[in-house]
Amino acid sequence: AGLPGSCARRCGALVAGPRLARMRIALAQIRSGTDPAANLQLVGKYAGEAATAGAQLVVFPEATMCRLGVPLRQVAEPVDGPWANGVRRIATEAGITVIAGMFTPTGDGRVTNTLIAAGPGTPNQPDAHYHKIHLYDAFGFTESRTVAPGREPVVVVVDGVRVGLTVCYDIRFPALYTELARRGAQLIAVCASWGSGPGKLEQWTLLARARALDSMSYVAAAGQADPGDARTGVGASSAAPTGVGGSLVASPLGEVVVSAGTQPQLLVADIDVDNVAAARDRIAVLRNQTDFVQIDKAQSRG
């Protein structure tokens, strides 16, 4: 009761006892178009709804600025450009931290697939960005033709909670998630425009739950809504990943706390970050982890 009609809410719990470190988060499962200004209006709308619902953080999908499948150099802007500054303004006005996907230009003619994380305040706190590390050269799509990779994992602090940033295909690489956990992340956001196809939605759900278990963290997986047959327009690519819905929050034990269908929706969930330390102490996979030398770089003694 008391949440907007478009919201779904469920509280996740791993251990009994008093609630000491609760955080309310929201996932905005939107359907981005090709007009960055119109998409920025969507950010404002959903950020306002999330703030009204009492959320401290709202996570938007990859490609919030402009959907994939169209030329991106034409819309790319620097992280201090008008679109990113619009996100910062929304965060300040709504009093909520916003994580959203955008594209930034590079010197080699490509773009970076970027997340901006902007909190309320003047100056904004946090105010950071992450460039997608693992590029989607799979399933008949070659992201690296138009997108340059990032190099560095990023963790930001939102109301005392350490939040790791990842984008879409990153979710298939467990080492990034365990590294974010090593750097202190208690919650990891993955912002996606997931590709459609047989079994892909099931893979998305499974991967989010698996990365939560790998990192012993909450995972907030925000995806683009399923566009249906709306993927048309000059320069559109039918192979481009443009969303399947299925946004979810997974607990450090891999439980689904809350999940969405395929259509645009705002999810709201309460998480207890004390559960992260409890899970890491109980299962101890991070503490017991062993690092291996890459076999192709090892010198043979035989």
Where are these regions (language model features)?
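A conserved C-terminal secondary-structure "cap"
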Residues: V276-G302
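Extreme N-terminal starter segment of soluble prokaryotic enzymes
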Residues: A21-A26
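CN hydrolase (nitrilase-like) catalytic-core segments centered on the catalytic cysteine
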Residues: D80-I99, I171-Q265
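Cys-nucleophile CN-hydrolase/nitrilase-fold catalytic domain and related Cys-dependent amidase chemistry
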Residues: G33-P36, G44-P123, H129, G195-S217
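Short beta-strand scaffold segments in enzyme catalytic cores
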Residues: G101-M102, N113-A117, V154, S247-V249, ...
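Active-site catalytic loop in hydrolytic enzyme cores
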Residues: R89, T106-R183, L187, G195-A210, ...
